[in-house]
């Protein structure tokens, strides 16, 4: 699989990193980072106790939403919420009345309550949470989205199913992670 440099993609769409505050992404990343307390693990040795997988992905989502004035985002795989929160931040910063639909069977209510203590409430106002497997939820959604992110179950069959179920749903951009 070919590695894609996010900075190259940002240049392709003429989006300047200097136009945004990376501190906002750091702040969201801090609260959504996976925690690893095992000081002997390779992850801890290379990333410290916090691990921010695909940090640049949030910047790309933000750039696409603000640059192209996208109004709808479908996310398969909420995980710790980084992508959805970056999308919500983009909607807020660009003054877009946007909508986020996120699908994940493992969304935890307690985790969301904790996040709400640190992340602006307005970010959550535009997010609809669907606590189901994508294979069950997607066939029930009869609409299109400007941006779709497939980042759920990473097995071949699950990704193939997510692709089959979303290929007619995205209008402008599709991201696989």
Segments predicted by a language model, with ranges:
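S-adenosylmethionine/decaboxylated-SAM
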Residues: 44-52, 56-177
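Rossmann-like AdoMet
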Residues: 1-52
